């Protein structure tokens, strides 16, 4: 390491005319440098005492030189110190002390009767100026009148606490305030004692204490547990054990009368899950979660309803699990139909919607059931007898055949029609639906197909039959074709020949145009191949010229290449990976 050289430093003025005189830096000899290094090594090994700063503190010899050396602009005297590495006092934040706190209440001062210099010209307070005054502007300010001077505002100090000061729960607490509570309790205690002394004096005057002292129980040391005297004398003890029975610890009971603790021991007769079936191939027991999900008696052939424990899987289907699954299914179906509901995002809305849906569904089923029963009947079939009478004996005799048909006894009811029976309107002698023809219903008496038409009798039948005959004749005439003349046949033949000639001409034109297009494409491809060869030749010549002598010509074109140019490029490009590329030029 080379010797440190201190540059010349201009003397800084200190205390007026005095100047700090600095010694000229001397160059270290090789011997001094060696001694200095040996001393540093001895200090690091602990054989030599460490350096001491101006405060008498030892300097750790293991601190590097770039940390321990003092900069010339801080201390030119080059004394050994670490003061420049410590926090500088002028840069430290000044925090409020723990005793400082905000003012509570208003300080009562004497009334000011004279205007003070620097006070508000309007009201006379010292804590603000005229432009910041909140009072109503006076006609003549307090500066000139000197009367009715307002008191100074209660200004709170600006406190800035450190980390501990902000979290000090007792900061600003005045212990003298607690003395008020102590005095209040002392007064209550004094009142209790005076009342107690007054009661004792009254009992002594009435002679009750003398009778209790002369009683045989008191002479033998026995005391009446429920006497008023014992209650009065032991009131303080009762206050201590007043709530002792209400705060029992789990597993024990505290008796305040006898002051003993009674343990509640519980006999455990339950069996551990892993001891129910010792077969290693039975249900798996998870020691981490203490769970056995499967039934341990599954391979033993026991009924799961008869055993005391059938696995933990039954919990998955208890409680609200099934209802929650139904709610989730309803949410999915409602979301598919356009409702913005979600089980996790808005469970309350989904629950209310699902409840209203179930109520509406039940109402709809009841309405549908009632409407069907009103229309078709059959309420008596729904009123089934009790279950115990379904397979019991009855007095109704029914005889069946081999095929299940009823031979004797209960007859099968005839199916009722949806139309009203035996209701004849508008002079009809038959009901509606008694006549059917060509997919339409009508009246048999007049062959009318209109339900609310009047009956026409046999005349209506004849009219309908005559209309049908006329319609059949018209359709028959139209179906017979008129015979064509020779002239008409000749004209049709000429038209067909013209059509055939036109088709042949169109085919010929298409074939000729296709051949012309192929020739044009071939010529364009030939021109594109020639242009591609010229371009490749130009590139080859340009690459042979020295880089410094090559012309700077941009080969970029803005137009899009044609299909023939792309085909020529594909045909002429080099393919080094193609094994047959060498035979292309031959």
Swiss-Prot record:
Annotated localization:
Nucleus; Nucleus speckle; Cytoplasm
Indicate the cross-link positions, Glycyl lysine isopeptide (Lys-Gly) (interchain with G-Cter in SUMO2).
Answer: 349, 408
Residue ranges, compositional bias (Basic residues): 498-510
Output the Pfam families linked to this UniProt entry. Slu7
Instruction: Say where the protein is mainly found.
Output: nucleus
Give the domain note.
The CCHC-type zinc finger is required to retain the protein within the nucleus and prevent its shuttle back to the cytoplasm via the CRM1 pathway.
Q: What is annotated about its quaternary structure and interactions?
A: Component of pre-catalytic, catalytic and post-catalytic spliceosomes. Associates with the spliceosome prior to recognition of the 3'-splice site for step II, probably during catalysis of step I.
Protein's recorded name: Pre-mRNA-splicing factor SLU7
